Structure formats: C-alpha cells, structure tokens
Amino acid sequence: MGRSLSPARFAVEQDKKLRAFIRENHNVQTLFKKIQSAAFHAEAPSVDLFVAGFPCQPFSGAGQGLGVTDLRGKVIHHIVNYLKARLPTSFLLENVSGLVHRHPSTFEHILALLIGITDKRGQPMYTVKWKLLNSNVVGYVPQSRNRVYIVGVLKKAQTEPFKWPSLVTPPGLAELLDPVPATPLAQPQSSLATSKLKAAYAQARSAGVNPSSQCIAVNCDARTCSWKVDSTPCLTADRGASHGFWISDRGGRMTVAELCRLQGMEPITNPAGLTDRQIGHAVGNAFTQTVLARVLAQLLYSAGLTDHVVDPWLTLGRQPEAAACRRTAKRSRAQ
C-alpha cells in the first residue's frame, strides 16, 4: 500500500476496489486480475525483481489450516511456473509462520520446487534462502508479526552472498499513536469484546500493569484475547478491518493512519474510494513495508542490481517512515 518509487512492469490484484486504488496510487504498467489466468502466464514479462505474498489463510493458525487442499493454497504453483518460465533476476516470497510450523511438509515441497528450477544440465539456477523474521525487530515497528521470507537470486547474476538484515530495537506503540482525547474507562460496543477486554485488564493488573495509565493493546475481537504493553499482537486483515486493537489508556480503537504506521507505511492520503474498513483490511493483509525494504536492500545488492546496500536502518540510523510519523505526532501534540 506504500508509494511506488519506480514503474512496476506488472502487478496482480483481483479485488475491484483495490485495483482502482493501485491505479490511482502506483505506477504499474500492466495490472492482471489473477495469477491463475491464461493472460498472466502468456503476457507477464521477465523482471529484475519479482515479489509475491501468496494467500496465507490456508496456512494460518487463524484460518482452517487446509494447506494446499485449499484452492488458495495452490497459488504457489502458479508463482513457481512464472519463475520457471521467466527466470527473474531475483524473487522474494512471503507467508505466515504457520507455513513452516503447521505445514512443514508443504513448506519443504515449496523449497524443493524453487531449488528444482534447473538449467539444461540439471543444475539449480537460483540460490534460495529463507528465514522467519518478526516485524518488530527487523521492521522497527511495535508489532509482533512473524513471517517467513523466501528469497532467490539467479546464480549467474549473483555478485555477493545474500545477508539477512540486522536486528533493531523497535519504538514503543505510544510513539506511533495520534494525539486524541483519552477516556481510559471506555468500553467497546460489543458485550463479548467488553468481557474479553475486562479479562485482559484483570490479567494486566495481576502482572503489575495499569491499563489506565500504560499503553496496552488488546486484541479483544479474537477468539482468544491477547494483549501487549506498548506493542501490539499481529495485525491481521480482519483485525485491520475493525480498526485494529483496543488501546487501554486511550479507551478506544486505533485509527487507519495508526494501522499504516504499524505496518511501516505512511498514512494513506488518496484512498481512491476505499472506506476505512477496506483500507484497514488491506493494510492488515499487506507486507510490513519496512521489513520488505530492508530485505530488498540486501537482495538487490546480492543480485548485482545495486552497487551497495541501501538499507534504511543502516543509512539513516532509524526507520524513516516511522520516524517521520513520530515527528508529525509530536508536532500535533505541541500545537
């Protein structure tokens, strides 16, 4: 959902309203509706960098966990077919950690498919690496979001070994929140959410945490309520659609701008007709932009596409989008 800095040869999105958003906000030459379509496989060109986040629901602990028996779980095979046919210089794939932990045989199968892209002599054409990365210590955002990242570099193009980004210390959640009137004793409209909120507050007090004066993010809409101090649980699409988490010392849910910051994005200024609920859903379904930026910095350098590592953290000493958001929030509080 972040800014396009250079033209993208193509993108894939089947949601009609998100397609309109992409056209309004991003420089994309061709926008395909489905990766499964004949048009995609016939027309999608080779690129220097291919990035895909294939559907996570089949592998997520929040879903039914059907794996590749879920039709959405078969999208990975279309991705591999594209890689085989077009041989992009580099690729990055992302999915939930449940792919590794709950479906290890499927994960090993996916890795085997990627390593199994071979030349005429039967030699692997890609160097393939993978790692579980948490957005809080890699993306410099106060969100616990563990995802598996798989990267590949075409061996004939590779100039340097690929290295994963270094770990960093994230800011506290309070630094990313907008200045709004605080009503700590407020409760959600839903009686079920209220009961879960009260249970979370009781747990917090037992742990020596004061919900009225400390920033606690409560996931009071989930089947199993969870909470974190000055940080948040994982922001999912469903949670994003319901304005994220309940903030205890504020007495209310998060704003759309705050959800964007939680994913390392600048707040969206041109929604292109999307409602707040639709934006929140899309943000929760997206990559953490700052993790993506840091991994891509290493990947592009390894693939010989840049002559040095342009890592936002190493270059600026801090994550730029979140830093800008904090400066904006501080100015607003001072006014």
Briefly describe each language-model feature range.
Residues 9-11, 30-31, 50, 128-132:
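Conserved beta-strand scaffold positions in the cores of enzyme catalytic domains, especially
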Residues 54:
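Glycine-rich, N-terminal phosphate-binding loop of Rossmann-like dinucleotide-binding domains
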Residues 195-335:
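C-terminal target-recognition/interaction regions appended to catalytic cores
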